Regions:
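Sec-dependent N-terminal signal peptides
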Residues: 4-13
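Terminal connector regions
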Residues: 511-537
Length: 537
């Protein structure tokens, strides 16, 4: 009888595991990626910490540092992120619930957002107070210094990270006649150059708010995630001085993807895994083998580079984490290789006829490119080349103050007119990985973002009215707009130059019956005769 019970229990466990794991086949080309190609290569060993006996967890995580991130025997922690105050202290806003809750991990919907503080970025973080009820928080600071802590279905706001009183509110969302992709949960935010905010929702839609609190306006009509099979969730977006970054997790396949963007709307996906189980490792090579790594969040340096990633981790299947058992969850901190600061010095656009490319590697505290870089190891160009060990090779170097200028032979760069941040991969003289993305002097990193609403039939004027708004940070370039209704073009009309956030309405004369609410529309934008954007309704 005991044997039968064991077999039934084992069968249930394996079925539960299979229900949460699907082996995703990697593209064959990923086998040829070099070190530095994958975002996953940026994870560094966790700082040395305290290891003790008699703690919760499966055997695979008993070697963990209990003082890393936040961990308490009686609390199951989950997602959260860290802000730093002007005194240098680190503030983690993280959700959690009593470990002995009747539903175990499934009590997550009743979680509380805690405010924890530490003098060290990696922790240990100690709870100082609670903010309120809520799950999967993400904290960000507004231009006026107030702090917003987003939670599913709402947010809390206070004057600062140390505030004792937090006020609850709800964001307003304007889908702008677009379908909301998979609802509005697990939102993630990035501050733009003008202190407005870009938001990505769980479904992969992109939204913009002028100040982080005003209505979020949807720009996209489809997800911006990689066009591959996956059960995507847990996006995290951030912006550094050069570009936007986005990581999204396929929770079923337990693989995450890394993307980059110049404007936060149009993305490229780099090859290789952003992270997989096992990225939490120690200096001696020992690995904390957590079953799941979810809710990634980044801490950024003064240049906006990600220097640490925090994860919600659990040692078993969520449904197997029961009250008063040996399983639980916590939030861990893993340092990241932040990358080099690079800039291309060629003033003219790089083309197939370009002979050499000059790249400046900036000196920083603790990094002297003139003495630390193994110049011969460097490769530079499009990520499509460099990630596979190809790209430009260095031919000589020059000194510029404390910085180093590396001159590359341009052949094989792979750089096209669409390139906005070419990549460098190499090693330092100790064999450690070096990488970075370079600013191009001829690229506009604050581009216009023209976006239309659904065309409306105007009975009085007998045509189509189309509202267009510039959500970008620069004035729009000369543009023509074409409306296609049920597959038939309604001709092109010139659009005047729109300043950031400016709205213009265009009227398209038509002798067709266009008042059908079920009609399908496309609004297409052309610049210099080339299609640059298409909105579908």
């Amino acid at each position: 009888m005991k044997k039968l019970f064991f077999l039934i229990a084992a069968s249930f466990f394996l079925t539960s595991v299979d229900a949460q794991i699907t082996e995703r086949e990697r593209p064959a080309e990923w086998q040829h990626l070099v070190k530095g190609a994958r975002f996953m290569d940026r994870f560094l060993p966790m700082p040395d910490g305290i290891q003790i006996k008699g703690i919760w967890g499966t055997d695979s995580v008993l070697n963990r540092y209990v003082d890393n991130g936040i961990e308490l025997p009686g609390v199951s922690f989950w997602g959260g992120n860290i802000l730093q105050d002007t005194d240098g202290k680190y503030h983690l806003f993280v959700c959690g619930w009593p470990e002995d809750s009747p539903k175990g991990h499934m009590f997550w919907s009743n979680s509380t957002v805690f405010h924890a503080v530490s003098d060290r970025l990696e922790g240990p973080l100690k709870i100082q107070n609670s903010v309120g009820k809520g799950h999967n928080p993400e904290a960000f600071q507004l231009k006026d210094g107030r702090v917003v802590v987003y939670v599913i279905d709402g947010y809390y706001i206070a004057d600062g990270v140390d505030s004792k009183v937090w006020t609850y509110g709800k964001f307003s969302f304007d889908s702008r006649d677009r379908k909301i992709i998979e609802g509005l949960s697990n939102l993630t935010f990035a501050r733009r150059q003008d202190d407005s905010y870009l938001m990505v929702c769980r479904g992969g839609g992109v939204w913009i708010s002028k100040d982080g609190l005003s209505p979020y306006m949807q720009l996209t009509d489809k997800r911006v995630y990689p066009d591959v099979e996956g059960r995507f969730e847990d996006p995290v977006v951030w912006r550094d001085e050069l570009q936007y970054h986005l990581i999204v997790n396929d929770w079923l396949g337990r693989i995450a993807f890394y993307q980059r963007s110049k404007d936060g709307v149009h993305w490229v996906t780099e090859q290789g895994e952003a992270y997989v189980p096992g990225v939490s490792f120690h200096k001696d090579g020992a690995v904390e083998h957590w079953f799941k790594y979810e809710r990634p969040k980044v801490f950024q340096d003064e240049k906006g580079r990600a220097v640490q990633m925090n994860f919600a981790v659990i040692d078993t299947i969520k449904w197997n984490d029961l009250p008063n058992d040996k399983h639980s969850s916590k939030n861990i901190s893993i340092p990241l290789n932040k990358g080099m600061l690079l800039s291309v010095l060629n003033e003219e656009e790089i083309t197939p006829s370009t002979r050499t490319i000059e790249v400046k590697i900036a000196a920083e505290s603790g990094f002297n490119p003139q003495t630390d870089v193994d110049v011969k190891s460097l490769r530079f160009g499009s990520f499509t080349e460099v990630n596979f060990g190809r790209g430009c090779k260095p031919v000589k170097t020059k000194v510029s103050g404390k910085d180093l200028i590396v001159v590359f032979k341009a052949k094989g760069s792979g750089i096209t007119s669409d390139e906005f941040a070419p990549k460098m991969i190499g090693k330092d003289k100790k064999g450690n990985m070096l990488y970075g993305y370079a600013r191009l002097p001829y690229v506009n990193y604050r581009p216009a973002l023209l976006s239309a609403r659904r065309p409306l039939f105007d009975k009085e004027k007998g045509g189509l009215k189309v509202e267009i708004q510039n959500f970008g940070l620069s004035a729009s370039e000369p543009t023509e707009v074409e409306v296609i209704c049920n597959g038939s073009s309604q001709r092109r009309i010139a659009l005047k130059t729109l300043q950031p956030y400016e709205i213009e309405c265009l009227m398209f004369d038509s002798d067709m019956l266009l008042s059908d609410d079920n009609a399908s529309y496309e609004v297409v934008f052309f610049q210099e005769g080339k299609e640059v954007e298409r909105n579908k309704f």
